[in-house]
Amino acid sequence: MKSPTKDSKLFHLKSNFAPTGDQPAAIAKLAEFQTNEQVLLGATGTGKTFTIANVIQKVQLPTVVIAHNKTLAGQLYQELKELFPNNAVEYFISYFDFYQPEAYLPAKGVYIEKSATVNEEIKRLRVSTLHSLSTRKDVIVVGSVASIYPTSSPADFAQYSLWLVVGKEYGLSELKTQLIHLNYVVNKQQLTPGKFRFQGDVVEVFPGYAQDYVLRLSFFDQQLEQIARIDPLTNKVLETLNSFKLGPADEYIVNQNDLGVALDTIKAELKDRLKYFERLNFPERAQRLQTITEHDLADLKAWGVCSGVENYARHLEHRPPHSKPYNIFDYFTKGEWLLVVDESHQTLPQIKGMYNTDISRKQSLIEYGFRLPSALDNRPLSYEEFRQGINKVIYVSATPREEEIQLSHNNVVEQLVRPTYLLDPEVIVKPKDNQVEDLVSEIINQRKHNGRTFVTVLTIKMAENLTDFLKERNIKVAYIHKDIKALERLILLTDLRKGEYECLVGINLLREGLDVPEVSLVAIFDADIPGLPRDERSLIQIIGRAARNVHGRVIMYANTISEQMDKAIKETQRRRTIQMAYNEQHHKTPMTVQKPITLNQPIKLKTKSSEQQKAALIKQLTKEMKQAAANQNYELAIEIRDSIFELEKQFRGKIKS
């Protein structure tokens, strides 16, 4: 990644496209920041991310973008990385592929140990984020709601580094100790991020935040003779340096000099807690807590780490009781910065709920003697703390809630006209008494213009039964559900686009993230049933799935028009009216989104492939992922990336077995 240029501008957007439709007006208004909190109400397919990128370019502020799940965060990261190739666009999500938190269920008397699977690449990207924030100003961080969980303090992360200077003398044993204190691990066989090895007078270090280079340190006696960046695959020297600041290998660093102080405060808290249990006559809880804590203290003293070390974070960071943990937003406190909350109608409620969920789980662990009360101080931010850290914020949503509108003091910027000038789809309401037979007729009519169909139902049973029925009527149909892996999901969507399927049936997977321009009909079964899957926002999101095609239509099957249906239909019609007026005034003709189908047939080798075939498939998919990104087809790029991850897991699992 290149460093920023000496140009006065920090951020440089690179794109072959210029803002169109509603984008120029939205960019100009958002960049004014008439209020510190604003809403970008952008209809599906209007290019909201491109608008935000242009705002970043205009305001020239370090930025955090938060999405409500990893998939959307990955899509935003890929897109912004392409748009800002010379800036530090970083990815900050939870590094757990699987996470079962520690818990105690008093009603059952069951203790559940923490269990987790760490994704090393995501872990590296998190360290890369902190490294960039500690060393650069031109940083855009794309994260999930996990961003409100604790991380290393800015002061500590910046402090723990190693300056390497050509000509300076280093004792190799001392250098090894310094690397270990930065959480680097010796590995003589294979260098991966966070590892180092000694080979005579040469030390090779793979920085914990790097991907495309290894640091080679060549010594003559005790003197550092050369610092070189080398290619980790070819060992080719990329460049030589006079000096280098090596950052930590890991996100969390324990200050060895102050460790004794932390151990003393943990012991003091343990002593007080044991007295508390004694007063209440709970000897079993006291004994349990003493055993667990003393074991952890021994490990901390010996290794600087222990199982569940995060529960002692407040002591290790020397924070006062009940204080706010350090988090990613603390790296942005030195000046103005921008926060973008993507899909704010979902992201803000998630942020609100995480604090109380964490407190509730830990209260039982503390009450029954599994953890000290200070464990509560390692927690996500409360919503109030999250709000306190905000500088400037843009809430982005096709369906913002009343809260975001109030927070922005009604400063809502609408972006309804698409770059393709497509209209929001026409919405038709039909009785649901004959919905299945009517759907069959509609799917057959779709064949006239080679259109595809999405159908959303309320239950798994309904989805399975409907899929079976449609198959009996010779409809090429598939059922897409939550248990389908990314690779299989990608195959289904690609086959739908190719025409191998003409219809996909699903439940709640059809609201966000499915971008299939061939879909010209979305059918919503039981649209009048009250509840979250059929509220106004959900219905508008579902309607948006048909907004990529010039023939886009939505059929709501319902015997009555519910209040939520009425609101969604009226909002869709309001948008259609604005879009039609714009097209008429500017003489624009709507065009179906053009999106190449790049995925080739060999992907169907899948899990039954030989290892050689899988390796070839990974190579092919990597090429297609890059091509999709180059074409700005970011949703497909993310789907392919997730498929590569799955294949790599299968590949590694086969090797280990």
Curated annotation (Swiss-Prot):
Entry's Gene Ontology BP terms: nucleotide-excision repair; SOS response
InterPro entries: Helicase/UvrB_N, Helicase_ATP-bd, Helicase_C-like, P-loop_NTPase, UVR_dom, UVR_dom_sf, UvrB, UvrB_inter
PROSITE patterns from the UniProt entry: HELICASE_ATP_BIND_1 (PS51192), HELICASE_CTER (PS51194), UVR (PS50151)
Sequence positions that bind ATP: 42-49
GO molecular function, one term: DNA binding
Pfam families hit by this protein: Helicase_C, ResIII, UVR, UvrB, UvrB_inter
Keywords (A to Z) from UniProt: ATP-binding, Cytoplasm, DNA damage, DNA excision, DNA repair, Excision nuclease, Nucleotide-binding, SOS response
Assembly and oligomerization: Forms a heterotetramer with UvrA during the search for lesions. Interacts with UvrC in an incision complex.
HAMAP family to which the protein is assigned, alphabetical: UvrB
Described purpose of this protein according to its UniProt entry: The UvrABC repair system catalyzes the recognition and processing of DNA lesions. A damage recognition complex composed of 2 UvrA and 2 UvrB subunits scans DNA for abnormalities. Upon binding of the UvrA(2)B(2) complex to a putative damaged site, the DNA wraps around one UvrB monomer. DNA wrap is dependent on ATP binding by UvrB and probably causes local melting of the DNA helix, facilitating insertion of UvrB beta-hairpin between the DNA strands. Then UvrB probes one DNA strand for the presence of a lesion.
Name of the featured protein: UvrABC system protein B
